[in-house]
């Protein structure tokens, strides 16, 4: 049996990179789940671009984390392995789809058989119009004027004094954000036409590299938390489906299956936007079923 390494690449924002210090995400969970069913080793690599001036003595512009399969035998792979499967999580919080183009040289070198693109959530969530128009009222502090500065916190600290402060500040921010959205119709960070234009260009670049490309749809959010976003997400998903078909990629609406895994509040953090650990596991299960209906087909059966 010939040995062949396999690479899967995942592009996206914080919903793919993960939340918190451990950055648990559906990619991490997918690696864990595949390991239980695979004869080959399954590794997870997480990379993100960083500012070069973070390090004073050495010139770095990429930071990462390696989650190597602990079941390796004599550093040569699991018994019966026909090649390792590496999952490359290249997502980064706070970065729009424009940042994905910087990874194309690495993707070319990796020659992945699969690229999963989870884009559009960061760009499409409805936020106060003042963010794009730069017309903030005087009473909004400067530190609250960032694109996500007033978004609901995903969670609070376990320490009561920190939790009390965080909860208090978050309550003021949510009151202010919802007031702004009520006073003036909110806007997404990026217009849907611009998003789809970038998506189309990205898909063209990925397809010429010979990879199977899967676009996953946006996940539902609470209209109470983000007024106007659920309806806008439906429109964005329809456009994502169209561009996927036009560019020869696949569109996978995993949100429909996620609803069968549990209640929304049990699968997402309190912001209703980021999947929690349970949500990440559920998404990984859904993705695994869709991507690997026959694990033997990827040499890991």
For every predicted segment, state its role.
Residues 1-91, 101-116:
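Serine-esterase "nucleophile elbow" of acetyl-processing enzymes
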Residues 3, 74-86, 95-277, 281-301:
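Alpha-helical cap/lid subdomain in secreted, periplasmic
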């Amino acid at each position: 049996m010939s040995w062949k390494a396999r690479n899967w690449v995942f592009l996206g924002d914080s919903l793919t990179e993960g939340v918190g210090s451990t950055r648990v995400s559906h990619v991490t969970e997918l690696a864990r789940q595949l390991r239980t069913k695979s004869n080959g080793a399954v590794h997870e690599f997480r990379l993100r671009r960083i500012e070069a001036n973070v390090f004073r003595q050495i010139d770095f512009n990429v930071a990462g984390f390696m989650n190597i399969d602990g079941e390796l035998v004599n550093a040569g792979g699991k018994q019966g392995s026909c090649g390792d499967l590496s999952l490359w999580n290249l997502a980064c919080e706070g970065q729009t789809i424009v940042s994905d183009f910087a990874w194309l040289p690495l993707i070319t070198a990796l020659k992945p058989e699969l690229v999963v693109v989870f884009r559009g959530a960061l760009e499409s969530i409805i936020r106060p119009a003042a963010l794009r128009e730069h017309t903030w009222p005087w009473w909004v502090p400067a530190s609250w004027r960032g694109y996500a500065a007033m978004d609901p916190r995903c969670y609070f600290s376990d320490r009561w004094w920190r939790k009390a402060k965080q909860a208090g500040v978050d309550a003021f921010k949510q009151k202010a954000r919802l007031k702004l959205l009520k006073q003036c119709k909110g806007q997404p960070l990026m217009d849907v036409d611009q998003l789809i234009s970038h998506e189309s260009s990205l898909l063209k670049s990925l397809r010429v590299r010979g990879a199977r490309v899967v676009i996953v749809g946006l996940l539902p959010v609470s209209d109470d938390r983000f007024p106007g976003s659920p309806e806008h997400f439906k429109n964005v998903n329809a456009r994502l489906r169209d561009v996927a078909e036009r560019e020869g990629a696949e569109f996978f609406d995993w949100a429909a299956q996620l609803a069968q895994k549990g209640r929304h509040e049990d699968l997402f953090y309190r912001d209703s936007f980021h999947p929690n650990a349970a949500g990440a596991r559920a998404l990984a299960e859904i993705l695994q079923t869709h991507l690997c209906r026959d694990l033997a087909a990827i040499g890991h059966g």
